[in-house]
Amino acid sequence: MDIYIEIETLITYAVLHNLVKKEDRILVTNAVLESIGCDSYREFTAEEQAQITAAAQAITYPTEVLDRIVEWAATQGKLTADTITYRDLLNAKIMGQILPRTSVIAASFWGTYQKDKVQATNDFYELNKQSNYIRTDRIAKNILWEHPSKYGNLEITINLSKPEKDPRDIAAQKDVVATNYPKCLLCKENEGYMGRVNHAGRQNLRAIPLNLAGEDWYFQYSPYIYYNEHCIVFSSEHRPMKIDHACFEHVLSFVAQFPHYFLSSNADLPIVGGSILSHDHFQGGKHEFPMEKATVKEKVQFKGFEDIEAGVVNWPMSVLRLRGDKDRLIDLADHILQSWIGYSDESLGIYAYTQGVHHNTVNPVARFKNGQYELDLALRNNRTDSTHPMGIFHPYEHLHNIKKENIGIIEVMGLAILPGRLKTEMASIKKLLAEAIAAGKPFENVYAQMSNDEALQKHAKWLEQHISNYPTPLTSNGLDSFIDKAIGDTFCEVLENCGVFKHTPEGEEGFRKFIKAVNNL
């Protein structure tokens, strides 16, 4: 490998895509050389330069050329350790030398926004892929399919984009000096941060400053996008998640500024919340989720808000949909939230408080659709008991082989994010089933084999149940569709578990009782 040709190709790519001005080419080249510990460079023949330009023009995103540069650094002993973590830190460092400063990117963003809001986000999204902040190569590894259900098509993904931690990195973390900078992975101080073995490098992160309802916020994309233009909007202040009147103001203020995007929030309580409760933030993007496509199954009316169109959504979880004037939506959403926070229905296992701890909250999802503001509110409760120690309205234990983690807002909206282990585990199950079918042996032999396999034993009862419920005899050609259906049915059941008002006569009547309680408050 000629490292100089690789660097020149990367810089040429950056110039072609307006990441680097021609006048800054030498400056940026030297910065990249410094980042990989290289103190020399060379000139290129006309033929080489032509080949470099042609190669750069053929690149959509610079993942491969960056990987080759990082590979060179690893072979030259330039990394603390040759692990994915340290390779990623160098990868971000190199692109951080190439990207313009935030002020330049933000000025370009808002300049385009004045002419075309959609183009502004399109350009910024593209920049995040060109900078390798969005890891397009890793995201492409994810497995995804649609699953038909009685609520509409659900979206299923097996997440393979996040690399496994190397044991050497895990061991090195114990030697890291504790630091409170940045306070978390969402703080604004991450922008340009060099990272460390236990904190991702963010030299190639750029965030756009925003004003939401008079407060300072920032807009960025997720490095591991789960759907189209998956963005994160986070508070300038490191403060805990909080679902309240201001939260509804913020999400609707955002969709007023970016009507082609939705914005949603994880819950602000453990178990029903997301993985980061310590920093106030939202997730949005340009994707029509299954929940958005779901119809309203029962129209309702709220006292004093007769101008707001409202209804119960035909969805496995308990969701209200509100449509109308932005400010009126904010006030009604807050009224519903306050009613829900104090609401109990012991016959359905819903307790607002136990031992002075409150359990009720909501997931809001804001949109601007067909000329109107729209706000979905998914009702959540995080109570536990001895039967369900991980959560009463949480995936039940018999589903934990597929999904045991918290159900966050992305999954509430109908997109399953399932662990990468399922790829190999399901492949092993399909192999056992195929062998049994070919040999004409009963599937009981497969269940017995699985029960003796540490990785597969958790799936044995689950598989037996889904085979017994499958409408047609299993064939070797139908194993893929069978497994996809079994996983999809399981995810649908997971969402139903999380619903506070079940799809039973008692549950539906309980939902109506809650709506009456809102109207009587």
What are these regions (language model features)?
Residues N228, H260-F262, S275-L277, P290, ...:
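Coil-to-beta-strand transition motifs
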Residues P270-S278, Q355-T361:
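Beta-rich nucleic-acid/ligand-interaction surfaces
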Residues N204-R206, S236-L263:
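Helical scaffold of the NTase/Pol beta-like nucleotidyltransferase catalytic core
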Residues A246, V255-S275, G284-S344:
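Catalytic or ion-translocation cores adjacent to nucleophile or general acid/base/metal-coordination motifs
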Residues M1-V233, E237-P240, N314-P316, I330-D334, ...:
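Active-site microenvironments that recognize anionic phosphate/pyrophosphate groups
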